[in-house]
Swiss-Prot record:
Its EC number is 2.1.1.182. Specifically dimethylates two adjacent adenosines (A1518 and A1519) in the loop of a conserved hairpin near the 3'-end of 16S rRNA in the 30S particle. May play a critical role in biogenesis of 30S subunits. InterPro entries: KsgA/Erm, rRNA_Ade_diMease-like_C, rRNA_Ade_Mease_Trfase_CS, rRNA_Ade_methylase_Trfase_N, rRNA_adenine_dimethylase, SAM-dependent_MTases_sf. Keywords: Cytoplasm, Methyltransferase, RNA-binding, rRNA processing, S-adenosyl-L-methionine, Transferase. Its main location: cytoplasm. SUPFAM superfamilies: S-adenosyl-L-methionine-dependent methyltransferases. It is an enzyme of class 2 (transferase). This is Ribosomal RNA small subunit methyltransferase A.
Length: 262
């Protein structure tokens, strides 16, 4: 049963509403909600994923910025289950406070125009997040899951993989959306790593090293990091200064950022 409703997509908000039942079902199966879990959907849109999740789980929190969608979401959800709506910009939502001691499971068809900021915002609250299932542009998912040596391996790959296990699940074609986007989409699963296993001494320092390394990716690390790393940093971290950022494993970046010279 499809309980979603029709509403015009707003280009200014980067809206593309999922409409294909096959892919809706695949996403719900991938999330596989269980009793007692706290599900939070970012950008429910017309409710394509919202209502199947609500029907299966009984309770759901959604974060929606478009005020025109609040009333129809509330109306359609009423006979299905308990829907709690947060009408705010997702980047202003404190996921840690929302979790309130029970790790949340984040789900969403993320707006293409702000997908990366949302990902980094979720990372800031990783300790309060059990897992994430997001649909994004396929090229973004490819970058998220890429490994060293890949042309698309970069800052996003390292920053996300340092804190999460990243798994690309499946591709969703443009025809599954209304209106159809110009590119393929893909669904990705992110599972935050146990904080005790993420040995990053200074998150800001780590982010600076990764940003600088990939900021001039064709340069050697010696040159790209010349303002923030001395030769002794490379020696202590056992990282070759003549290597390029795209050749380093995530663990290499972590070791390099963790070096503290006397």
């Amino acid at each position: 049963m499809n309980s979603s409703f029709s509403a015009p997509a707003k280009k200014s908000l980067g809206q593309h509403f999922l409409a294909d039942r096959y892919y809706i079902d695949r996403i719900v199966q991938a999330v596989d909600p269980r009793a007692g879990q706290h599900l939070v959907e970012i950008g429910p849109g017309q409710g394509a994923i919202t209502f199947p999740l609500l029907r299966r789980h009984g309770a759901l929190t959604v974060i929606e910025f478009d005020r025109d969608l609040i009333a129809p979401l509330t109306e359609v959800a009423a006979p299905i289950g308990a829907l709690s709506i947060i009408h705010r910009d997702v980047l202003s939502v404190d996921f840690t406070a929302l979790a309130n001691g029970t790790p949340i499971r984040l789900v969403g068809n993320l707006p293409y125009n702000i997908s990366s900021p949302i990902l980094f915002h979720a990372l800031d609250h990783a300790a309060a997040v059990a897992d994430m299932h997001f649909m994004l542009q396929k090229e973004v998912v490819d970058r998220m899951a890429a490994g060293p040596g890949s042309k698309v391996y970069g800052r996003l790959s390292v920053m996300l993989q340092a804190y999460c296990e990243v798994t690309a699940l499946f591709v969703v074609p443009p025809g599954a959306f209304r209106p159809p986007p110009k590119v393929d989409s893909a669904v990705v699963r992110l599972v935050p790593r146990d904080p005790a296993t993420v040995q990053i001494n200074d998150r800001r320092r780590f982010a600076d090293v990764v940003r600088a390394g990939f900021g001039q990716r064709r340069k050697t690390l010696r040159n790209a990091l010349s303002t923030i790393c001395e030769p002794a940093h490379f020696d202590a971290a056992q990282v070759r200064p003549d290597a390029r950022a795209e050749q380093l494993e995530v663990a290499d970046f972590i070791r390099l950022a963790n070096v503290e010279l006397a």
